[in-house]
Amino acid sequence: MRIGLFTDSYPPYINGVSTSVETLKYALEAEGHIVYVVTVGQDATTYSYDEEKHILKVPGLPLGIYDYRAASIYPLKVIKKIRSWNLDVIHSQTELCMGIFARLLAKQYHIPLVHTYHTMYKDYTYYVSRNHKYFDMGCKKAVEYLSKFYCDNTADTFIVPTIKTYHLFRDEYHYNKEIYIVPTGIDSSRFNRENVDMLKVGEMRKKLGYKKNDFVYLFVGRMAQEKNILFLLEAMEEIKRKKKSNIKLLLVGDGPDKDLYDKKMKEMELTDCVKFFGSAPWTDMPLYYHLSQAFLTASVTETQGLTVIEALAAEKPVLCIEDEAFHTMVVDKLNGMFFNDVSTCVKEMIELSTNKKEYNLLKKQTKSSIKSYSLSSFANSVLDVYKVAIDNFNNKKDFPNIVHNTVKKLFDKKEDEEWKLS
């Protein structure tokens, strides 16, 4: 197949969607398919196309939210290039700029469209509402309407990564069409101990000031309100109060609230047991998993939580807050533990760090618990959905054009012009 992935996030930008899209590209190519990526670049004026990697980047302007950039929803300069690919299917990975572009192209040039819903937008509305109760309620209703519109009216098939997102659409949004649950896979071999430079891991532990008997909990993610970082700091404050000085917490990642949490950590006098490392290259992530003993997260806004799968691939037991997003990955007392509040979290953190027998038992069962997240399984599950999308597209009757006819009239006259990438 010739497949087009449209996304607003792609490396070098680091987040869950970016990782998922890059992983999907790699997995599909490993199965013999040709995969193109259309994404937003880091420059405000430059178009670029990597002929070897099949990655097309359009200009983008900073939004002022993390490192996100906004692009034109119909960048004319790249239309001819994309048409030359003769795509069999378009797979949208976003509801925003490149997602709208994907929908317009799919409709205008009669290409089947698959959409994956990656982000629990209802958990992020406070960025707009600033936690104003009634405004936030309105924002959540708008998110519900737009989410249903994108997934119901504009896509031939619809993918979600977890049962949590499935229930959001079925139970809260009352979405009645077929939903395909396809968890993102990972290249677990990257995290195998034999493929990691353990000498470098030892050097990193030493540089961070960790002693041989220190039990290090690792969190990897964005330093922002939705990741519930304050919860982790409160847990560490209680652990310090209990004089468990060998328990440490390392937080890897950047974000809008990093300085706020760093200040809070100092106010709570946790500098001896908590470290904020900042962002780290994706290629170095296996090193961080292996310098820790276990993974810890209190985030309740995940659609899937790829970092949890990565931790399990590195044979690290996972302690996570009770949330449906983690239920398909973590089994209590098998490869990790669940907690509901700070006191339970503290209790389990201490238990795992002191009960060597239980720790080794959980560790032993980590890798076997993520076999279903292999790259091959991921690619073939998505390919099955593509086949359904193509069948649905070929069998359906014409449907309302919404804004597509208007766009077609505006831009069809430009098709024969030469648009060259700079």
Segments (PLM) and residue ranges:
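Short hydrophobic beta-strand element within catalytic cores of glycosyltransferases
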Residues: 317-320
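Conserved acidic donor-binding segment of nucleotide-sugar-dependent glycosyltransferases
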Residues: 332-343, 351-356
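Short alpha-helical donor nucleotide-sugar binding micro-motif in glycosyltransferases
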Residues: 279-280, 287-292
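A conserved mid-protein helix/loop that constitutes part of the nucleotide-sugar donor-binding site
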Residues: 19, 215-238, 249, 256-262
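Aromatic "clamp/platform" in nucleotide-sugar-dependent glycosyltransferases that forms part
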Residues: 300
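Nucleotide-activated donor-binding/catalytic signature segment of Leloir-type glycosyltransferases, i.e.
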Residues: 260-280
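N-terminal subdomain of nucleotide-sugar transferases
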Residues: 1-45, 49-57, 403-422
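Carbohydrate-associated surface elements
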Residues: 41, 164, 185
